[in-house]
Amino acid sequence: MKKKKLSVKIEVLTGLHIGIGSDKPEIGGIDNPVIKDPISKLPYIPGSSIKGKLRSLLETESTNFNKKVIDAAFGDDENTPTRLIFRDISLCEKDKNAFNNGSILTEAKTEIKMNRKTGTAENTALRVTERVPAQVVFEGEILIRSIDDDDEKLNEALLSEAVKLLNNDYLGGSGSRGYGAVLITIN
């Protein structure tokens, strides 16, 4: 099987929240933290988040690729080898340095749940969500495994369409509230 590495760049356009949840939010603390590397403590984008979102968009919005092609690229229930391998995407070096020296921090967005009938905030409805701010850049790679040149071209076309769909959608949680607009480029 032939392997090809593609470089991926993801620019955050609006606050990005890919969370881990919190079973013990502290008073005044973050209810919904972003996922961070356990060693560096820096935010990252799990490969599974990108893979799942791209696959979902292709399955629901693409008219160019059928289920069989999508399953071959992303995997199916029969444990056949996938054509696309998504690595975790880390901060670019510039932003990694900025996070480490404190010039870029995650942002805390406070939200409330409104009672539409009364027009007031619900009791215990205050939430604080951690986000990666706009203009932060992540970099990483996607690996394409191909049987032959035609298979490689098909998977590159499928990935290209999926990225176009995601660039017009959102990544992570709370997209309907404006979170997670990203610009993905692949070389």
Q: Where are the model-predicted features located?
A:
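RNA-binding basic/glycine-rich loop and surface signature characteristic of RAMP-family CRISPR effectors
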Residues: 1-114, 121-187
